[in-house]
Amino acid sequence: MTTNLERDRNQQRLSFGQAAAAYDEIRPSYPREAVAWSLDGHDRTVLDLGAGTGLLTLVIGQVAETVIPVEPDPGMRAQLEARTPGVIARAGSAEQIPADDSTIDAVLAGQAYHWFDHEKAHVEIARVLKPGGVFAPIWNIRDERVAWVQALSDAFEGRAMPGYNRQVEKATFGDLFGPVEARRFDHSVTTTADGMVALMSSRSYFLTADDDTRQAMTAKVRDLVAPLGDQFELPYVTYCFRAYKL
């Protein structure tokens, strides 16, 4: 039986395709050093799980011999292939990965692990990984040590999926993997009030909201960033987690 939470999760998970081009333009990329740490030398054949528009795929391609993006949303796959000539995105999900057993050196997941059915996904990820292969979820998170960023998060936290961005901190990846290691990387992007509105408009809670709610959220964002001037730095922390297949 499907619960309301599961229905909400599925609706949000598949909402991004309608804004694929905007997502591609405004979501931050990942520091190369964060990806290199996540791979830990397992860089021959890397699978980007829940690849979206290919933000992480591009960075993986800079440090790995072969990258295989996997994405369930056709709109996101089309955008990925448009921005990464020669790369073919495979249709699939964390619960049904289109790869043979023991053929992948590393599986990375950028901004995606919180959408997975973890029990099923852990088994599938372990199936496709070679012995000793690495699984590494990654998140770009706004740096809430900065006061205005914390205020922004406080304003919209209740609209995100429960546990979003925090559910790996004390987790394991099941009996098929060893202990989870973690590391963080600080970085920032230069943006504007319009850029912040565009960033919020790519969030699942905005994409699935009604028009009145969207207008209210947009006004709130503009109010929060108005004191920051025409351009300002949006600070991020990239959180990386990795564990090795036993």
In which residue ranges do the predicted regions lie?
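Conserved class I S-adenosyl-L-methionine
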Residues: 1-50
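Residues at the starts of beta-strands that form the adenosine-phosphate
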Residues: 45, 66, 134
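Class I SAM-dependent methyltransferase SAM/SAH-binding core
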Residues: 53-96
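A short acidic, Gly/Pro-enriched loop at the edge of an enzyme's catalytic core
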Residues: 95-106
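A short SAM/SAH-binding and catalytic strip from SAM-dependent methyltransferases
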Residues: 105-119
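Conserved catalytic/acceptor-binding region of the Class I
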Residues: 120-189
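Conserved Class I S-adenosyl-L-methionine
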Residues: 169-246
